[in-house]
UniProtKB/Swiss-Prot annotation:
5-phospho-alpha-D-ribose 1-diphosphate binds at R79, R104, D131, P132, M133, L134, A135, T136, G137, G138, S139, D200. The gene is upp. It comes from the Bacteria. Its EC number is 2.4.2.9. The lineage of its organism: Bacteria, Bacillati, Bacillota, Clostridia, Eubacteriales. It comes from Clostridium perfringens (strain 13 / Type A). Pathway: Pyrimidine metabolism; UMP biosynthesis via salvage pathway; UMP from uracil: step 1/1. This is Uracil phosphoribosyltransferase. HAMAP family: Upp_B.
């Protein structure tokens, strides 16, 4: 079964309180989501593979560790996941960015891909899927399935807030994918919103309803 990491750093929890607040406007909301994403990325990337190289300082030659291979690909789930990308790129500026857009067919309830643009070398990269909310878990699980079909092997999921139901769903669908969240909330309500949650992340990021 995959590992679930709840990142309870004081700075993250402080900023998360203002993200939740319904009186926080879109400008501040966007900035806070970006800041929390950057802070979370530090923990999410903790176990990236390393390799040893030799460099020369002004004093002598020495061996140092650097990231191995082709590094990271960040893949936001449209559209709310876009709000997390800039913060992560501040910490991992060399990362490539892919995009996945999915919706569910109302009759078949099956996922329908309406947009997918990924780095050609996605199979060689450590992939971090980002979405502010992990509610039912359906969209995240579908996005991960799509990534695996495109060849991705090392995948992590990073969300600001999750429901217990969403975590359980993704773990059952993808027991090999570790999940990182800033907070695991109480439950989903009858409308599929996380309680207490933060409302609709996409609407709050982009000022829409």
């Amino acid at each position: 079964m995959s590992k679930v990491t709840e990142i309870t750093h004081p700075l993250i929890l402080h900023k998360l309180a203002f993200i939740r607040d319904k009186n926080t406007g879109s400008k501040d909301f966007r900035e806070l989501v970006s800041e929390v994403s950057m802070l979370m990325a530090y923990e999410v990337t903790r176990n990236l593979p390393m390799e040893e190289i030799e460099i020369e300082t002004p004093v002598c030659k020495t061996k140092c560790k650097v990231l191995a291979g082709k590094k990271v690909a960040i893949v936001p789930i449209l559209r709310a996941g876009l709000g997390m990308v800039d913060g992560m790129l501040q910490l991992i500026p060399a990362a490539k960015v892919g995009h996945i857009g999915l919706y569910r067919d109302e009759e078949t309830l099956q996922p329908v891909e309406y947009f997918c643009k990924l780095p050609q070398d996605i199979a060689e990269r450590d992939v971090i899927v980002v979405d502010p909310m992990l509610a039912t878990g359906g969209s995240a699980a579908d996005a991960i399935t799509l990534l695996k079909k495109r060849g991705a092997k090392q995948i992590r999921l990073m969300c600001l807030i999750s429901s217990p139901e969403g975590i359980e769903f993704v773990q059952k669908a993808h027991p090999d994918v570790d999940i990182y969240v800033a907070c695991i909330d109480e439950k989903l309500n009858d409308h599929g919103y996380i309680v207490p949650g933060l409302g609709d992340a996409g609407d709050r990021l982009f000022g829409t309803k």
